[in-house]
Amino acid sequence: MSSIWRIFWDPNDPDYTDNLKNARKLCADVGVSEFLSKLLVARGIVDAQEAKTFLEPGMENVFDPFLMKDMEKAVQKLLEIRQKKEKLVIFGDYDVDGVTSASLLYLGLNEMGFDTQAYIPSRMDEGYSLNTDAIEDFRNKKYQNILTVDCGVTSVQEIKYAKELGMTVIVTDHHEPPKELPCADAIVNPKRLDDEYPFKGLAGVGVAFKLLTAVKSKIETNFDPFSLIDLVAVGTIADIVPLLSENRYFVRKGIEKIKKSPIAGLEALIKELRIQKEEITSQIIAYKIAPKINAAGRMADAFTAFKLLISQNHEEISKNVSSLIKLNTKRQAKEKEIYLYALSLIDVNPELKESKVIVLSGENWHLGVLGIVASKLSALYNKPVLLVSKDEHSGKGSARSPAGINLMELFKEASKYNVFKEFGGHELAAGFTIDSQDIDSLRISVNKAYEELYKEHVPYYEVFIDMEIENVWSSFFEDIERLEPFGYRNPEPTFLIMNSHVDNFKFFGNGVENFAAKMRSQKDLIMDVIGYGLSQKMLDLRYNSQLNLNMDMVGNFRVEKVHNSKISYLKYYLKDFEIKNFDVNSCEYKNVETNIILRDEIIRIGKLNVITDNLSSEKVSMFLPPRIKYATMLKKISDSLSASRKVVIIGSSHIVLSHTYSIVSSYITPSNIYYNKKSRINSKVLSHESVFFVTL
């Protein structure tokens, strides 16, 4: 991906002198190090009181819940329901924010004497938010009252139906409301245009927490809503809302509670993941805990995650933790399967990669992982990506885009070609449905729309860098820790390290998309380096068994501990890099092109000198039969031969190779193929033949 580096503390920046004055004043007024004051100024914090509040958020960050529009109405309706001892159903969403919201209100309201049940719709069968079938089911079960969490503000027709049935509907949500609001009894959403609540960035679970505290203020009870603040922290972090104002306080208090006494289900999940409670950070919640909770809604039934979070029964908790781990493993496998298949489709059809918008489809792709795969492909190719799961009649799709390309604008422009049955979403993430026979039309339409809106514009990724750094010091990590929790609108401090020596590369992940290495800075700072999703930038270097080079690197420092040990080690998580003094012509396998990344196989075959000596000057395509469909392989072989490339087909055994040969030779002229059961190859064979079968 194209990237631009923006260094805040750049001595050549025209604002550098003024920023430095602000930092030094902050340093004196607040009593912090100059390093920490510089990090604060880089985040736009120059006022001493604002800095103190940011570093030590307290209850002064928390606003009166009754400042929110319709909060009084919602609380009054709930008190009436409680007084009449009527049943109340909490209708949630299947993501982490929705599940934690439902769990929070279920536990909190029941503690205060409400008769509540919870309902979370199926992602695959029901989709997002309220639906008439569920409403009908509630009425049949004598639930006359619905309380939505993290959804509902767009459910205009569904809420109208519920009201026609005589039901009470209270909406709590944080998504952008439509012009026409539903006819609910109360709509609590800080993003309402007529809402003057001071902070608009609450997650769904944050809005639910405000409702819970408001109800508690009207009831004589020993229940403390902050006893469930760990749920608020997890949902807020997972939903990627700004970690500012109230959110910052809620998340910090929630992490403190997780470290001391988390709810039973959360504690069991943390233990199963072999995470030390005292080491919990917002990053650990975002990348290790939240995905496991999310796996339930993605792959099966989000109610599994809900049951884990509300349960006190050890046996039930253990069962649900096990289910989440299995579902997450299944999610990873499905994600890998679709990701590699998508790469293979692009490889066989290079014109897809050349288009401004990549559109791919597959039979019954799992809807729960399409968004994740689309995100990875969008980052890989720096383009909008639309993935469609199709059956005989229809297709459901997920789209992701790099910054600078608005999917909603793109879809609105493309909709004039009548390809969408429906679509919705945000600037960088969207969903849609089409007729399955319209996939080619969709591809043409969105690319036309792109040209009309963006012409030849190529998106770029802007990397914000706090400052250049050469080494770390004793108070370095203590200062950084004071800025936590990190997340959206409060990112981890990002540092530039110039001209570091990097070696001992290892590639891992789907299609070998990530890499790890050892780094030594010019000041002899030695540490592990991790580059998630960055191996594509290595290009041909991925096939070099002895990578040894210098880089300018941008990333975040973290101190991590070995499980069940006091041993700590320093890691540097890369966001971007530039390779310095490396000549691509020195790469061992610069002429190799593969259908997917076969680094280990290529290095092993590279030890066969007779092959490398004779093919090093020509372009070579390589394939590993078990990993690629034969139709795909045949197409690629044909394309390679048309381009005058040699083709090496690698087999794990003679049996596999023999079977592959019998198929290939039915389509490719046998006179161009070299196959010998003993795999004996010499220079004469290599110079005369085009396709070679080799076992390892």
Predicted regions and their residues:
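Terminal, basic amphipathic appendages of nucleotide-handling enzymes
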Residues: 1-32, 42, 46-57, 61, ...
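Hydrophobic helix-and-loop "lid/oligomerization" segment in the mid-to-C-terminal part
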Residues: 5-11, 16, 20-145, 164-166, ...
